[in-house]
Amino acid sequence: MNTVRVTFLLVFVLAVSLGQADKDENRMEMQEKTEQGKSYLDFAENLLLQKLEELEAKPLEEDSEESRNSRQKRCIGEGVPCDENDPRCCSGLVCLKPTLHGIWYKSYYCYKK
């Protein structure tokens, strides 16, 4: 019975001592992985920041380009004389001859469609 106890005690001591060594090793590995993880996180954060800056800059460029190119030229409002050959009526208006009889300064005016 003593041999069983001694054997059990010996196995127990070996397991504890080897377990402690593994625990220290695991702790060191975890620290290394944590440091590597931080560097990966920093790299990923910088990459994400660059992408975000690119995305933020893109709409601003598009907006400024649109505002330069899509600006509507001055147009003529409703009931204002217009030129038959070069109508500059605002959107939704058409350059037409007036339907009423009378003396008009010009023969064409901007009317709603």
From Swiss-Prot:
- Single GO MF annotation: sodium channel inhibitor activity
Instruction: Provide the residue span(s) of the region labelled Disordered.
Output: 57-83
In the record, which residues are listed under signal peptide? 1-21
Taken from the UniProt record, the cysteine pairs bridged by disulfide bonds within this chain are 75-90, 82-95, 89-110
Q: Which residues form the propeptide?
A: 22-74
Recorded source organism is Cyriopagopus hainanus
Q: What does this protein do?
A: Probable ion channel inhibitor.
User: What information about domains appears in the record's comments?
Assistant: The presence of a 'disulfide through disulfide knot' structurally defines this protein as a knottin.
UniProt lists the family membership as follows: Belongs to the neurotoxin 14 (magi-1) family. 01 (HNTX-16) subfamily.
Q: What is this protein called?
A: U11-theraphotoxin-Hhn1a
Q: Name one Pfam family in it.
A: Toxin_22
Name the organs or tissues of expression. Answer: Expressed by the venom gland.
Q: Which GO terms describe its cellular component?
A: extracellular region
For bias kind Basic and acidic residues, which ranges apply? 57-69
Which UniProt keywords are listed? Disulfide bond, Ion channel impairing toxin, Knottin, Secreted, Signal, Toxin
Compartments (UniProt record) = Secreted
